[in-house]
């Protein structure tokens, strides 16, 4: 994968999060193979994730403040407005938690989330996140490439797509008591999209364990697609031969296609995609093709009509 030449900006210079400036010193002390010994039985939201290493995946963009990232959320399982999830997601219990990896794989497995956390070295990736509603943020995610998990379960030749299924628990996810969507939430990627080095399996942000409202304890992040493609609070990962029908496509097929690549030239029926409002900014900015990751991912869609396959 080609790396961008974006200037490196120290996290301490671009974020107001008070505790964030200590992370570099912490990581240096905990890096490498010795990090495994630092893991407690489990970690709760707000605790530091040990052994997180930095990579070249940084941006010139300023980070969105932690308070905005944690309190401006689309997570319909906890409510349909942006502020409710941060107030109601405390009811979600993220331990014990398992993720079943199944379907067209040679080595299906039921992972305890704490074992999944230690499957590969954790790294920080600063990514843009673009919502189809026309707003965006910049988030320092913590996780590892989803490809690390995929390689270990060895997909068969029949595996063409990867489906992600969110927990269904109306008692703890009160939004699931409504009929606004067909629960549980489902999303999917082509196998090559899931294997792409930019696609992350995520366990934290800002160096800390994911807040519940941001998809704890494990989610995916696909930075060149609209945010609804990045499934949260995952309990099943299925490898299948036929293209799955995702939740939003099932709900409104004329508005939500399978691919959902960020594309300023293809508007949603309700929202222009030409510009976006970055949280914390007053003026809108032009939206970048593939959310600014065209150099890395455009080849995945060579020859495709992106207006037809939206």
Swiss-Prot record:
<dbReference type="GO" id="GO:0016672">
    <property type="term" value="F:oxidoreductase activity, acting on a sulfur group of donors, quinone or similar compound as acceptor"/>
</dbReference>
<dbReference type="InterPro" id="IPR006311">
    <property type="entry name" value="TAT_signal"/>
</dbReference>
<dbReference type="InterPro" id="IPR022867">
    <property type="entry name" value="MsrP"/>
</dbReference>
<feature type="binding site">
    <location>
        <begin position="76"/>
        <end position="77"/>
    </location>
    <ligand>
        <name>Mo-molybdopterin</name>
    </ligand>
</feature>
<feature type="binding site">
    <location>
        <position position="219"/>
    </location>
    <ligand>
        <name>Mo-molybdopterin</name>
    </ligand>
</feature>
<keyword id="KW-0732">Signal</keyword>
<dbReference type="GO" id="GO:0043546">
    <property type="term" value="F:molybdopterin cofactor binding"/>
</dbReference>
<feature type="binding site">
    <location>
        <position position="131"/>
    </location>
    <ligand>
        <name>Mo-molybdopterin</name>
    </ligand>
</feature>
<dbReference type="GO" id="GO:0046872">
    <property type="term" value="F:metal ion binding"/>
</dbReference>
<feature type="binding site">
    <location>
        <position position="214"/>
    </location>
    <ligand>
        <name>Mo-molybdopterin</name>
    </ligand>
</feature>
<comment type="function">
    <text>Part of the MsrPQ system that repairs oxidized periplasmic proteins containing methionine sulfoxide residues (Met-O), using respiratory chain electrons. Thus protects these proteins from oxidative-stress damage caused by reactive species of oxygen and chlorine generated by the host defense mechanisms. MsrPQ is essential for the maintenance of envelope integrity under bleach stress, rescuing a wide series of structurally unrelated periplasmic proteins from methionine oxidation.</text>
</comment>
<feature type="binding site">
    <location>
        <position position="166"/>
    </location>
    <ligand>
        <name>Mo-molybdopterin</name>
    </ligand>
</feature>
<comment type="similarity">
    <text>Belongs to the MsrP family.</text>
</comment>
<feature type="binding site">
    <location>
        <begin position="230"/>
        <end position="232"/>
    </location>
    <ligand>
        <name>Mo-molybdopterin</name>
    </ligand>
</feature>
<comment type="subunit">
    <text>Heterodimer of a catalytic subunit (MsrP) and a heme-binding subunit (MsrQ).</text>
</comment>
<protein>
    <recommendedName>
        <fullName>Protein-methionine-sulfoxide reductase catalytic subunit MsrP</fullName>
        <ecNumber>1.8.5.-</ecNumber>
    </recommendedName>
</protein>
<dbReference type="InterPro" id="IPR036374">
    <property type="entry name" value="OxRdtase_Mopterin-bd_sf"/>
</dbReference>
<keyword id="KW-0574">Periplasm</keyword>
<dbReference type="Pfam" id="PF00174">
    <property type="entry name" value="Oxidored_molyb"/>
</dbReference>
<feature type="signal peptide" description="Tat-type signal">
    <location>
        <begin position="1"/>
        <end position="45"/>
    </location>
</feature>
<keyword id="KW-0479">Metal-binding</keyword>
<feature type="binding site">
    <location>
        <position position="73"/>
    </location>
    <ligand>
        <name>Mo-molybdopterin</name>
    </ligand>
</feature>
<dbReference type="InterPro" id="IPR000572">
    <property type="entry name" value="OxRdtase_Mopterin-bd_dom"/>
</dbReference>
<dbReference type="GO" id="GO:0030091">
    <property type="term" value="P:protein repair"/>
</dbReference>
<keyword id="KW-0500">Molybdenum</keyword>
<keyword id="KW-0560">Oxidoreductase</keyword>
<dbReference type="GO" id="GO:0042597">
    <property type="term" value="C:periplasmic space"/>
</dbReference>
């Amino acid at each position: 994968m080609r790396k961008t030449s974006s200037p490196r900006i120290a996290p301490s210079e671009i974020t107001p999060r008070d505790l964030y400036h200590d992370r570099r010193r912490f990581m240096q002390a905990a890096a490498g193979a010795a990090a495994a010994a630092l893991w407690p039985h489990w970690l709760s939201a707000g605790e530091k994730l040990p052994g997180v290493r930095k990579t070249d995946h940084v941006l010139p963009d300023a980070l969105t403040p932690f308070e905005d990232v944690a309190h401006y959320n689309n997570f319909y399982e906890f409510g349909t407005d942006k502020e409710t999830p941060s107030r109601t997601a405390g009811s979600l219990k993220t331990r014990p938690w398992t993720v079943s990896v199944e379907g067209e794989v040679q080595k299906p497995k039921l992972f305890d989330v704490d074992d999944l956390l230690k499957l590969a070295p954790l790294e920080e990736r600063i990514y843009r996140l673009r919502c189809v509603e026309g707003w965006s943020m910049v988030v320092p995610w913590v996780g590892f490439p989803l490809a690390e998990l995929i390689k270990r379960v060895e997909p068969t030749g029949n595996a063409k797509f990867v489906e992600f299924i969110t927990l269904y628990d109306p008692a703890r996810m009160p939004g699931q008591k409504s009929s606004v969507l067909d629960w549980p939430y489902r999303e999917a990627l082509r196998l090559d999209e899931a294997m792409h080095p930019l696609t992350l399996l995520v366990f934290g942000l800002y160096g800390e364990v994911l807040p519940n409202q941001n998809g704890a304890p494990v989610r995916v992040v696909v930075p060149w697609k609209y945010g609804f493609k990045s499934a949260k609070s995952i309990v099943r990962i299925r490898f299948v031969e036929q293209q799955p029908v995702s939740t939003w496509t099932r709900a409104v097929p004329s508005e939500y296609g399978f691919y959902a690549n960020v594309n300023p030239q293809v508007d949603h029926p309700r929202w222009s995609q030409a510009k976006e409002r970055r949280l914390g900014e007053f003026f809108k900015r032009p939206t970048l093709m593939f959310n600014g990751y065209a150099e890395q991912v455009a080849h995945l869609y060579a020859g495709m009509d992106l207006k037809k396959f939206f």
